[in-house]
A protein has these predicted regions:
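Conserved phosphate/anionic-ligand binding catalytic regions in large, soluble enzymes, centered on
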Residues: 37-57, 145-148, 232, 236-248, ...
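An N-terminal, well-structured beta->alpha segment
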Residues: 6-105, 193-195, 200-230, 240
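Short Gly/Thr/Asp-enriched flexible loops that form oxyanion-binding sites at enzyme active sites
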Residues: 101-109, 152-159, 307-328, 359
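N-terminal small/polar loop signature for handling phosphorylated ligands or for N-terminal nucleophile
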Residues: 81, 89-152, 250, 255-310
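Gly/Ser/Thr-enriched, mixed-charge loops and adjacent short helices
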Residues: 32-37, 41, 153-283, 290-291
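Phosphate/diphosphate-binding loops
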Residues: 120-181, 277-301, 330-336, 348-359, ...
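Phosphate-binding and adjacent anionic-ligand microenvironments
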Residues: 296-298, 321, 339-522, 529-533, ...
Length: 562
């Protein structure tokens, strides 16, 4: 089957000679042919993400055009002339092939008579979300693979509220994409004709200014004193966030910001880090070296598309401490609840089913509402829309994913590292003014609410074989349930595929033990990985740490021996 598909592509008149040469280069590598052609590159409810290359299971201009034709067909069917006139905003990051993919997206939409607003250069994911709202566009497309390795690129779709697509749009667009013939079903228009017909408009600096203007409004205490006294090292990890983040920090008065020069320029090869993910502490090597040199107490790093933020902060012994996504999330929650003025009675904070249970404790003990949604920031965006439409009672205060994604404000409907970086600088300054630090404030939260500690173990399983292994693990976990794990009785077994509470069905399994340990397993929606989440709690720090170490070993052993 996959060999037939390989031959079909090799014989296609649509491919250039260079593309055919790329295919010929793998002629003797059947495993690579299989991985490139055994299935269509999945266009799921989160869009599309995959390894760059030629093949129907690879990210390339043909799959980009197919996806965009499906999106165009859906827009025309669902919204008619109105949607065509409202148009689609397109942005792209610094990854390899991102510019070409953005242009192919634009030319396919124009070929279908749909107006396009294309950024004239690289921009962040949150600014794309903002642009959809600001331009009152029908939809948006972001060309990015976020923090994936350099071999990847991706395609994310947003709807008119600036959030990534959810149902009914998600299933409608997926069906429309699947119906498109990759070579013969696509309508294209060249750039010159699109501009002449008013179907292609380039956008840039005016939207940048408006975006920064709206981000500033979300500062909790914009007038905090001694901003010039806090020294911050900053890195965009070769991505797109340097311009907006350095600008916002400067305009807000943080004058002692030291960029990591080796990582400041956009470069899709990510030359200083194999994996440009701020969750990975190794990416902070250059940052902490610079911080030691200049005497900075905090390092901020963003992922390549500028929607996520990681930290390195000094502990009380002058050593670097790397708070995880949950720790940064609870820090935001506690800070906002204690420092934001005029919080409405129905103020609500939102996180996902795999984030720390400590979040709910903090929010509820401060008299506000905590909501949980499935993983994917689009579900947080969906709740914000429901609040605005009065379909749900609440006023959005803060949302986060444990994978270092945060949003304060409603100026965008996706995670935003620009606003998050600004507020992190504010928190660090506020704490320093009070004789404290980010590290100390995290410790205070644990001392106040209990030592709820977490770890996430991602296991990579590449290619067709890897996908089958992941599916086998999830199947076994559903079929072979145990009454106890690591000697602790199972209190509750939640299979989100069968439906839990009022959440949509999802491939997630969560086990709650009698001692309030949470064990969660899910396949990643964006990478060839299966993720194991462990969350333990105890009033004593040492006991909690020992419990976490034991369960890390026992839970993986449990999963492997199902």
């Amino acid at each position: 089957m996959y060999l037939d598909e390989y031959k079909k592509w090799l014989d296609s008149t649509m491919l250039s000679e260079d593309e055919k040469e790329e295919l010929r280069s793998i002629a003797n590598d059947e495993k690579e042919i299989e991985n490139s052609f055994y299935t269509n590159l999945s266009f799921g409810t989160a869009g599309m993400r995959g390894v760059r290359g030629i093949g129907k299971n690879r990210m390339n201009k043909y799959n980009i055009r197919k996806a965009t034709q499906g999106l165009a067909n859906y827009i025309i069917e669902a919204t008619g002339e109105t949607g065509k006139k409202k148009g689609v905003a397109i942005a792209y990051d610094s990854r390899l092939d991102s510019v070409e993919n953005a242009i192919n997206t634009a030319m396919t939409l124009a070929g279908n008579g749909i107006k396009v607003y294309l950024f004239e250069g690289i921009r962040s994911t949150p600014e794309l979300s903002f642009a959809v709202r600001e331009l009152k566009a029908q939809a948006g497309v972001m060309i990015t693979a976020s923090h994936n390795p350099k071999e990847y690129n991706g395609y994310k779709v947003y709807w008119e509220d600036g959030a990534q697509i959810v149902d009914p749009q998600a299933t409608g667009i997926v069906s429309a994409v699947e119906a498109v013939d990759i070579f013969n079903g696509v309508k294209l228009m060249d750039e010159k004709e699109a501009i002449e017909k008013g179907l292609l408009v380039y956008v840039g600096e005016k939207l940048d200014d408006r975006f920064i203007e709206e981000v500033k409004k979300n500062a909790i205490n914009p007038d905090v004193e001694n901003k010039d006294k806090i020294k911050i090292v900053y890195s965009p990890l070769h991505g797109v966030a340097a311009r907006p983040v350095e600008r916002i920090l400067k305009e807000m008065g943080y004058t002692s910001v030291y960029p990591v020069k080796e990582q400041e320029q956009p470069d899709g090869n990510f030359p200083t880090c194999d994996y440009a993910n701020p969750e990975d502490t190794s990416v902070f090597k250059l940052s902490t070296e610079l911080a030691d040199k200049v005497g900075a107490e905090i390092c901020i790093a963003n992922d390549p598309d500028g929607d996520r933020v990681g930290l390195a902060v000094l502990d009380n012994n002058g050593k670097w401490f790397f708070p995880n996504g949950n720790q940064i999330g609870i820090l935001f929650a506690e800070y906002i609840l204690n420092h934001k003025k005029n919080i409405p009675a129905n103020g609500t904070m939102i996180t996902t089913v795999v984030s720390t249970p400590l979040f709910d404790t903090i929010v509820k003990k401060n008299g506000k509402k905590a909501l949980r949604v499935l993983t994917g920031f689009k579900y947080i965006g969906e709740k914000i829309r429901q609040f605005e439409n009065k379909d749900l009672d609440g006023t959005f205060l803060f949302g986060f994913e444990e994978s270092i994604g945060y949003l304060v404000g409603t100026h965008v409907r996706d995670k935003d590292a620009v606003v998050a970086s600004m507020i992190i600088a504010e928190m660090a300054t506020t704490f320093k003014n009070n004789g404290s630090s980010i590290y100390n404030e995290i410790i205070k939260i644990y001392e106040k609410y209990g030592w709820r500690l977490e770890t996430t173990i991602p296991i990579t399983k590449k290619g067709k074989d890897g996908l089958e292994e992941i599916q086998k693990i999830m199947k076994s976990m559903r079929e072979k349930t145990h009454t106890e794990i690591a000697g602790i009785k199972v209190k509750e077994y939640r299979d989100y595929q069968k439906g839990v509470e009022d959440l949509p069905k999802s491939d997630v399994i969560q086990i709650v033990l009698e001692d309030e340990t949470y064990l969660t397993v899910r396949p990643s929606g964006t990478e060839p990985k299966i993720k194991f989440y462990i969350s333990v709690v105890d009033s004593d720090k040492k006991v909690a740490e020992e419990k976490l170490a034991k369960l890390e070993k026992e839970f993986l052993n449990y999963a492997e021996n199902l």
